[in-house]
Amino acid sequence: MVQLFHLTFTQGFFIGQLSVIVIVYIFLRFFLFCTKEELKNVQEESYPLSPSNEKSTTEFNDATHKVTPSLSEIYDVKTHEEESLDWFNVLVAQALSQIRQDAVSDDAALKKLQTLFNGKRKPSFLGPIHIKSISLGQRYPVFSNCRIQAQPDDTNGLRATMDLSLEDDIHFVVNTSAVLNVPRPAFAMLPVSLSVRIVHIRGKLSIYFSQSSKSAKRAYLNFTFDPDFDMGIEIQSLVGSRSKLQDIPKIAHIIETRIRKWFITRCVSPQFQQISIPNIWPSSAREGHRQKSTE
């Protein structure tokens, strides 16, 4: 009797998602990022053209070019309606859930943040910084109203612009000390406890591709926020050992300004963040073909 192999619902679900991701990636890599020069080189290496079939190949390329639909026939950026992105929200929620589990399992986020705070840029008037607790939140961002628009600085490029809303409680608690270095180093220390919370982030997010070139062989997925973003930050402070001062406005203002400046200089237009897209296009060296010598 032949026993058939049956997948569970969970296994089938993840295999299906993986298949979709692979298909989308292959489509982006080979159809969007394959330049005419790369395509021509591959055709020349795989199928060298002889004088007898050059004419037929040219006619075939011309015919193919005529029947290839333009982008406006597939997606008209001027008339297409905004998309809800419900499917995208589900994928982002699954990825974010896994990131949170990994960060909690081995305290990766806590260790990374503590190393960052105690780096070379730490002011001399602050003692060692200890992260008492950290939370990456429990809710998920909601993306909506996606629109495909032309790049403002590139006539051929497109970008996806969408609304982002995150209502959550992302926070960390820090214990440190204010150090008085006069009249001598570490003359006196004042304990300081801080609680920093990010309660909401709202704004417009733009995502676009940077195509690879000869100088930069990798392609990148870029994302940036519009300058009119809204970030809700709550700061609580406790200063002193015996007589404690609570929620000093000046401390809250300094920390909030630092956080906003850090975000603006990295993630707000014209600044952007990049995610490198792996190059899976096989090179002639990896395939074992003979490299052509340049004369």
Curated annotation (Swiss-Prot):
Subcellular location: Endoplasmic reticulum membrane
TM ranges: 13-33
Lumenal side: 1-12
Predominant place of localization: endoplasmic reticulum
Record's bilayer topology term: Single-pass type I membrane protein
Residue ranges of domain SMP-LTD in the record: 81-278
UniProt-listed GO biological process terms: aminophospholipid transport; mitochondrial genome maintenance; mitochondrial outer membrane translocase complex assembly; mitochondrion-endoplasmic reticulum membrane tethering; protein insertion into mitochondrial outer membrane
UniProt GO molecular function: lipid binding; lipid transfer activity
A cellular-component GO term for this protein: endoplasmic reticulum
Disulfide bonds: none
Cytoplasmic-side segments: 34-295
Keyword annotations from UniProtKB, A to Z: Endoplasmic reticulum, Lipid transport, Lipid-binding, Membrane, Transmembrane, Transmembrane helix, Transport
Family named by the database record: Belongs to the MMM1 family.
Subunit structure: Homodimer. Component of the ER-mitochondria encounter structure (ERMES) or MDM complex, composed of mmm1, mdm10, mdm12 and mdm34. A mmm1 homodimer associates with one molecule of mdm12 on each side in a pairwise head-to-tail manner, and the SMP-LTD domains of mmm1 and mdm12 generate a continuous hydrophobic tunnel for phospholipid trafficking.
Function: Component of the ERMES/MDM complex, which serves as a molecular tether to connect the endoplasmic reticulum (ER) and mitochondria. Components of this complex are involved in the control of mitochondrial shape and protein biogenesis, and function in nonvesicular lipid trafficking between the ER and mitochondria. The mdm12-mmm1 subcomplex functions in the major beta-barrel assembly pathway that is responsible for biogenesis of all outer membrane beta-barrel proteins, and acts in a late step after the SAM complex.
Free-text comment about domains: The SMP-LTD domain is a barrel-like domain that can bind various types of glycerophospholipids in its interior and mediate their transfer between two adjacent bilayers.
Record protein name field: Maintenance of mitochondrial morphology protein 1
Primary gene name: mmm1
